[in-house]
Amino acid sequence: MIEFDNLTYLHGKPQGTGLLKANPEDFVVVEDLGFEPDGEGEHILVRILKNGCNTRFVADALAKFLKIHAHEVSFAGQKDKHAVTEQWLCARVPGKEMPDLSAFQLEGCQVLEYARHKRKLRLGALKGNAFTLVLREVSNRDDVEQRLIDICVKGVPNYFGAQRFGIGGSNLQGALRWAQTNTPVRDRNKRSFWLSAARSALFNQIVAERLKKADVNQVVDGDALQLAGRGSWFVATTEELAELQHRVNDKELMITAALPGSGEWGTQREALAFEQAAVAAETELQALLVREKVEAARRAMLLYPQQLSWNWWDDVTVEIRFWLPAGSFATSVVRELINTTGDYAHIAE
């Protein structure tokens, strides 16, 4: 298995170094649900600003304040503890009376707004996230500047970030032990983390191998292509390659890579043979995913940060702003810019 730090770069290994997250204010995340609260219903959507506390901790504190069980407070995604983050929590509070959430107090946390909503906010139910990152102590401004320009055109690999695999790769190591011993894992969180790490590592490996090709975005026979921003895909045939290539070049279509698991992977012929060869050595992880009935899926191979802009405060400090769809990792963008001295594994998704 390829270590995360050794995965293939789209723009070549960065020439310079830099510091990511010198302080929490250097990593700002604003959650974008993609919808507004209904204004009625048995749930309350609460938009919070937090610094120095993780999402679960705030959710538990909110439940205690509202005198409801912790499982009655949900969220669309975990946000980093060591960052300034803005996100929505959802509390189930039936009844006509609206609690006064302006009285909710928690160090490092502020309620920005709240309103009634008809449906529970479920994990993953967000459109994306807007990021404002500050890279400090940048050693090669010209290289970073050129990379930012190139990323606007060519994007970055849509790798799962190192944080998906746990500190020191602990989640992936857990998956490997589980695969090798076949010992039942009762802890639901561990099961989820380990299976996710296994599938993500296989995806990363497939993408890393594809990026070694001379023309990364060249459609081949049997590729599974996805309409940009959509989840479904279709298979490319030899007769359509020229037309499909044009649509990929226009970013209307995205080439996808496998999230291996049980069932068909989605590619056929040449593309399927390539993907299978890329992870052929990882038989134990593949067998684990099949055994645990994790369904195979697809994910775009490349990621195009939207609304990408940047501002150099001085020759060694740059502020970068961009928006990413749900499930994508800001650290996969930073990885193409600098050899960072920050710790990826401590950054929540």
UniProtKB/Swiss-Prot annotation:
One of its GO terms (biological process) is tRNA pseudouridine synthesis. Pfam families: TruD. It catalyses: uridine(13) in tRNA = pseudouridine(13) in tRNA. GO terms for molecular function: RNA binding; tRNA pseudouridine(13) synthase activity. Gene3D superfamilies: TruD, catalytic domain (3.30.2350.20), TruD, insertion domain (3.30.2340.10). InterPro entries: PsdUridine_synth_cat_dom_sf, PsdUridine_synth_TruD, PsdUridine_synth_TruD_CS, PsdUridine_synth_TruD_insert, TruD_catalytic, TruD_insert_sf, TruD_pseudoU_synthase. Residues 155-303 form the TRUD domain. Responsible for synthesis of pseudouridine from uracil-13 in transfer RNAs. This is tRNA pseudouridine synthase D. It comes from Shigella boydii serotype 18 (strain CDC 3083-94 / BS512).
